[in-house]
Amino acid sequence: MGLLYKGSKLLNIILDSLEDQEGGAMYISCDVSNGGPVEPETGYVPNNPLFGLALDSPQQECAASCVGCLSCQGNTALPISSLTSSDFDCGGCFDPTIGVLGSQINTTPPASNLSASGSGVGNHNNGAALAGNGNSYWSTDEMASTFPGLPPLDIDPLPSLFPFSPCGASYNFASNPHQASLSYTVHPHQMLISPNGSQQQQSQSSTHPHQLQSQHMQQALTQASHGGNALHNHNSSGGNGPGGGGGSGSGSACYYEAATNAPAPPMYPSMSVNVSMNMTMHHGYGADGGPVPMQCSQMNWTPPSNSSAAVNVLYPPLLSPTHYPASATYSFTADFRAPPPTALGALPSLADKESPSPPASSTAAALGYYATGGVGQGYTPPHKSPSYQAAALSLGLAAFEDEEESIEDGDADADGEGSAGGDMKPNLCRLCGKTYARPSTLKTHLRTHSGERPYRCPDCNKSFSQAANLTAHVRTHTGQKPFRCPICDRRFSQSSSVTTHMRTHSGERPYRCSSCKKSFSDSSTLTKHLRIHSGEKPYQCKLCLLRFSQSGNLNRHMRVHGNNANGSGAGGGSGNGSGNGSGSGANGSAGAGSGLIT
């Protein structure tokens, strides 16, 4: 009893030290042969590699070559000193004719099966190298160094604390880079599988189920490109199939894909995979270049038909990953099968998606709308007489059609656009009511009301409200008259003068006074006539402050001031006063005034 008490105390120390390690413990629920479930308290397994994997095998009868396990000793004792094989591998403790349990959770399949892989690319167990490891994981020296101050563990058998056998958990810690280790967490019913050879932190155990699908699809496509067959072995429990490891194959979830046969089944974002706990991972699980944690949403371990127990480990539902590491293979989940012809027929063609060209009837209607003045009805091109058009064609006067006013008065309008009777012209002068077809013409007209003359002659300092008038005025200094009448060969310095002169030959008088019904050939003459009815006199002498209705009359009055300076103002006044007509009368009054001044 004293020795048993010491052994129990030593076991408690070992369990406490192991629970302090990272990873904690896990719970599993087992169904034993009698059908009664085992409570989680009795199924508690510490994070102790001594007892192999947490998912232990079902109970079977051991072979005669077994050196001693719980099954052989009637679940009474566990002689630790007798476990000398590689990582506590029973080394064929079960009858191979019944079905070696290592096919479910053993990582060391027979070497003969490894050589029969053929063209399969999914099963990379490397079992030959693992089975060749004949050293024990914990030697006597390591036990002494791990627990200083304690004698080597050479104790009597202890009472069994666990209702299942540690056999079959050949958990080799060899240097195979594709062999996975178990990282136990502190949460019940959760287990994290990491594809690298070391235990991972829980914070690094992010889940990427799409990588499973991506790697499987890459395997299938790669093998199909070589003309071979791809074997995706999810649980490595296949029988003697192509590329398969050892095992009974009843609980396997392998699917065999031929490169030239039926296409692969569609992948789904959240898979329910039947997996036997084979810890030697294939190339398809995770990336080879770095640790890529993986996790499935549900794992169902199905024992072979001749086994007596089953272990069902359920995991919480898996959330969709939102981030892929930089070292992972970026992929998408899709069904690579070609859609059926019916589905393709239901899709609209690209020609249907394009907007059709408008029919000829609508195009003709639109053209007719523009032709009939549906848009821009407010603008009517100015009418040109046939005689003027013929003269313009013969002389090439198109470049001078913008010269609108004469030199004598700067308020002449362009091509008759200054008439008050213009139809639907939006540019209206609010001072005199005149309308113009263009805003620039209205702006020029407003200068006549404001008296602005921004264009000045460099020779005589005479100013004008329009640039065309200044250009025509400069020609008076040079004597240039480029415009000629085709009928009487009379020449003019500006094009507007030719236009007005051509109306004298045709007799056309398009501008009519609304008061006396008198008509005129140009707009400037009508403007002068309208000032008689209105009494407007916009031109004023700066010396005597007399006002005139026409700029020509003011110019003649200024000559009088020049003559009076020479002493001939009275004679000029009497002479001018004897004239007739409104123009002569104005000149006479101006002469009389100048005589009074002198």
UniProtKB/Swiss-Prot annotation:
Gene3D superfamilies: Classic Zinc Finger (3.30.160.60). This is Protein glass. GO terms for molecular function: DNA binding; zinc ion binding. It comes from the Eukaryota. Disulfide bonds: none annotated. A zinc finger (C2H2-type) spans 427-449, 455-477, 483-505, 511-533, 539-561. It comes from Drosophila virilis (Fruit fly). Its main location: nucleus.
